[in-house]
Curated annotation (Swiss-Prot):
Transmembrane segments: none annotated. It comes from the Bacteria. This is Probable nicotinate-nucleotide adenylyltransferase. GO terms for molecular function: ATP binding; nicotinate-nucleotide adenylyltransferase activity. One of its GO terms (biological process) is NAD biosynthetic process. It comes from Sulfurimonas denitrificans (strain ATCC 33889 / DSM 1251) (Thiomicrospira denitrificans (strain ATCC 33889 / DSM 1251)). Its EC number is 2.7.7.18. The gene is nadD. HAMAP family: NaMN_adenylyltr.
Amino acid sequence: MDTIALFGGSFDPPHIGHEAIIEALKKFKDIDKIIIMPTFLNPFKSNFYAPSSLRVKWLREIFKEEKRVEVSDYEVLQNRQVPTIETAKHLLESYKKIYLVIGADNLAKLRDWNSYDELKELVTFVVATRDDIEIPDEFIMLSVDEKISSTQLRENIQLSKLPKKCAKEIYDFYKEEHCKTE
């Protein structure tokens, strides 16, 4: 295995938009493996609702039957914020090429990422479409039709927007969390 797609994120909660991204990535013929990497701590967010161990558990349940998909707890096990550059360097010890998958909503802050200039030399960016955000030609565009975000979902949790394999568990968790914050 030489080529991977790295799809990192908070996944707080995981939703059908994340599943749609994985389905679109599976169509890339040169990707040997898709690695989903939940963050321990997102540098652009102040907190998480679901603990990292629970987010990893949900993702593993959702994608357990996908042969080319692995849910990695590498960043979670570091018990700290892990810059993407660090994760990329770690993975390049085992793989030759990395497609780094981000949502179009991340483009506005991309140049603020830790060691962005070095990172763009190490990975090929793949940008999932979202909210009609224009994707510059320097990136590979990944067409995804789901109009959903984890933030919107936390504010108005809907079973229909959650992955079927653990929808009820995720729904119940966020319903209870929402009640605590009201």
